[in-house]
């Protein structure tokens, strides 16, 4: 019942916030992976 009362803009905002969170988490994981790769190259 809540979905019928919500306007389309609110759903778009939720989708954009979710994509932003996924992008931030993926960049953090990518930076940690890069640091790990550099650490392996040193040894």
Swiss-Prot record:
GO terms for molecular function: enzyme regulator activity. The chain crosses the membrane at residues 9-29. Residues 30-43 are cytoplasmic. It comes from the Eukaryota. The keyword Transport does not apply. Keywords: Cell membrane, Membrane, Transmembrane, Transmembrane helix. It is found in: Cell membrane. One of its GO terms (cellular component) is plasma membrane. Residues 1-5 form a propeptide. Pfam families: PMP1_2 (PF08114). Its main location: membrane. Present with 74700 molecules/cell in log phase SD medium. Monomer and homodimer. Associated with the 100 kDa subunit of the plasma membrane H(+)-ATPase. This is Plasma membrane ATPase proteolipid 2. It comes from Saccharomyces cerevisiae (strain ATCC 204508 / S288c).
């Amino acid at each position: 019942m809540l979905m019928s009362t919500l306007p389309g803009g609110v759903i778009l905002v939720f989708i954009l916030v979710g994509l932003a969170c996924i992008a931030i988490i993926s960049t953090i994981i990518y930076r940690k992976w890069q640091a790990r790769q550099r650490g392996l190259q040193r040894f």
